[in-house]
Amino acid sequence: MHTDISSRFNYERLFRFVLPSVVMMIFISTYTMADGFFVSNYVGKTAFTAVNLIFPAIMVFACVGFMFGSGGSALVAKTMGEGQMEKANRLFSLIVLSALAGGILLSALGYFLMPFLAASMDASGEVLACSVFYGRTLLLSLPMFVLQRVFQSFMVTAGKPSLGLRMTILSGVTNIGLDALFILVFKWGLLGAGLATVLCEYAGGLFPLIYFLKRNTSSLQLVNPEWDGSALWKTCTNGSSELLTNISMSFVSMLYNYQLISIAGTDGVAAFGVIMYVAFFFEAIYIGYSMGTAPIVSYNYGARRDDELRSIFRKSLTVIAGTGLFLTTSAYLAAPVLADIFVGYDETLATLTVRGFRFFSFSFLLNGFCMYGSAFFTALNNGFISSVISLLQSVVFQIIAVIALPLWLGTDGIWLSVSIAKLLAFFVTVSFWIACRKEYHYA
């Protein structure tokens, strides 16, 4: 049965529609975890620490893709809901071209700033050298990474979430296969890990670009773009919450790494790296669900179908509550096994990782509501509220927690910081839902 964003959704149809986006994000997190697994177990703890130290800095430059993807897809989906298909294609083309240009400029800027960024996180010696080398290697494919993130959002808007999944799987299999080839067979070490990621991102960015350039069966087509400064500004402001979320997550990760080096040494950074790999896998479910439902919300808002908007909102809260309970329980119980996969070769590091992950696991209980809340308001084209939620949960609350809690609890305070921040953000999100329900008619 064909399902697109204009359909009426029961739970079965909703799950079927968002499943490709959820699986896609899980798969992305899986091959990201594969990078960590190969580097940690076959290149060494120093390289693993370096990768985790510099990766947040790389993501600062890549975040423009999330902004253009989420903000642009919301605007295009709303335009489609209003029945203006030709305008939707022109906007889509302008957004893709702008994202590519931004990725190229940021790649060049990042190359020159990389040594300063690594040094600012208190890296020194071999860790510093490895961080700069790995960071500059990954910047070679930054424009393609940006495009990949943009197309992930637009595949859903175009009514082709399953195609986005297939392209992601192709990209992921490429990365895992090349990791094994370059690291295990060719013995290229950190260079091999970086090149595997670069080639994977080129595959993930070029294939959807070619698809939309050719005649296709989706709802969208790349055409000659027409400059529309106001629409581009709307895309950037509407997607600013996702930009803020991802930039802030990167800067907060840098702050975590700085605190951990000061309190627990390089083992703390390595343990935090393991926790982040696994957390991304768990949070990928929330990200994929939010990404999958956002075009549905935007379409129904644009088409003024309040009854369907209310239905999607209520169903989503139920799904997120059940998922949060399941993920929190699973994370707590599986912590020893997950730590052993990445750092089983070092008993002290594994013990530190298990303790940290069990404190961290409580954040999954409420994190889904915060993520969905931000994405929901973006889909309603209210970038301001979405940005406030993102800024508070990802920056303000976490910075306060990671600075204050270690003063009383030491390293445990660092592990608890995310959970405390998500609890505070949950109350903010619920407050906005209650305050805006009459304006948008979703409750």
Regions found by a protein language model. Give the residues of each.
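Transmembrane alpha-helix boundary and packing residues in multipass membrane permease domains
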Residues: 21, 25, 37, 41, ...
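Alpha-helical transmembrane segments and their lipid-water interface positions
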Residues: 28, 32-39, 62-69, 73, ...
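Short alpha-helical transmembrane segments in multi-pass integral membrane proteins
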Residues: 1-18, 76-141, 185-240, 297-363, ...
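Transmembrane helical elements of multi-pass membrane transporters/channels
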Residues: 16-35, 137, 171, 200-204, ...
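Short runs within selected transmembrane alpha-helices of multi-pass transporters and secretion channels
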Residues: 69, 137-156, 167-175, 193-206, ...
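Small-residue-rich hydrophobic transmembrane alpha-helices
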Residues: 48-108, 145-164, 271-335, 367-389
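N-terminal transmembrane alpha-helices
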Residues: 6-43, 56-71, 75, 100-107, ...
